[in-house]
């Protein structure tokens, strides 16, 4: 599957090529770290988020809803976006400036839990048992001082854990924060989040949905597999973009990005352990059987 004349590791990204000198177990551990792979759909979403972040303050700030199936890669995109815009410290005022605050919607959402989760995210000491008005006042005071440009709320489909009245209250809270702080709010969740927001005409118009869909067989997916292969410290090229391997990967994972990453990482581990040093169809099939 590889050209024997190729220089060992020539198919790898430069930093990954250096890992080939490590013992097998160290290479396997290195593969288990989180990795970021640029691909067109993710880049498009990151560009959309960047445009939101750059929007000048106005009365009605633009917002959006990023949705897709569980493990499709939504959270990884948000983490990449947050990493690209780290906080700074205002030495003169002694205040941390965070352009982006990213949090998770509590599993059982209500105002008290939401404010407590937000305060926890920004590192603000507080009593979770305090009254809603106290938590709200503390949150508003701190956020006005920090001047964030964007609030990201992941797992927003947890809204559906509440009854209709509680869902409306949580949605009104999100609109209130966007208006009060004049910042964009980005909601992230599964398709259930779309259902929840569609029950409120104002929310559905305020938060236009953008979907991160499953992968299908395409040139873009082959480019993704090629980019992923460059980050796996195997001594030989696996040529993952070959049609038979592409179809095996899609059949085993359903086109879910997180499942694809897990499949390829485990297959690469098998390739290291059996000394073949390249992912073959047999490795993919073996991992698929173990995880079925």
Question: Where do the model's predicted regions map?
Answer:
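A short hydrophobic beta-strand->loop->alpha-helix junction that borders the nucleotide-binding pocket
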Residues: 96-109
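C-terminal alpha-helical "lid" subdomain
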Residues: 1-19, 71, 218-219, 226-292
């Amino acid at each position: 599957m590889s050209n024997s004349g190729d220089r060992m590791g020539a198919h790898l990204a430069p930093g990954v090529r250096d890992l080939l000198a490590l013992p097998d177990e160290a290479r396997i551990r290195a593969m288990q770290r989180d990795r970021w792979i640029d691909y067109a759909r993710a880049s498009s979403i990151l560009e959309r988020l960047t445009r939101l972040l750059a929007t000048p303050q106005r009365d009605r700030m633009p917002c959006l809803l990023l949705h897709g199936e569980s493990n499709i890669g939504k959270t990884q995109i948000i983490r990449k976006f947050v990493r690209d815009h780290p906080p700074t410290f205002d030495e003169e005022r002694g205040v941390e400036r965070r352009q982006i605050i990213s949090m998770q919607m509590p599993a059982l959402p209500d105002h008290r839990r939401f404010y407590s989760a937000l305060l926890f995210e920004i590192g603000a000491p507080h009593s979770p048992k305090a009254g809603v008005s106290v938590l709200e006042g503390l949150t508003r005071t701190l956020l006005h001082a920090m001047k964030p440009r964007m609030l990201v709320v992941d797992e927003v489909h947890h809204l559906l854990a509440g009854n209709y009245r509680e869902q409306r209250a949580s949605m009104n809270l999100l609109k209130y924060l966007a208006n009060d702080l004049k910042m964009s709010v980005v909601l992230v969740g599964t398709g259930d989040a779309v259902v929840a927001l569609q029950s409120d005409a104002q929310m559905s118009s305020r938060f236009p949905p953008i979907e991160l869909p499953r992968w299908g067989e395409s040139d873009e997916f082959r480019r993704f597999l090629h980019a992923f292969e460059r980050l796996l410290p195997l001594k030989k090229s696996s040529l993952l973009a070959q049609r038979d391997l592409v179809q095996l990967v899609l059949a085993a994972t359903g086109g879910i990005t997180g499942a694809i990453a897990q499949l390829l990482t485990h297959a690469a581990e098998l390739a290291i352990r059996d000394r073949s040093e390249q992912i073959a169809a047999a490795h993919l099939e073996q991992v698929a059987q173990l995880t079925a």
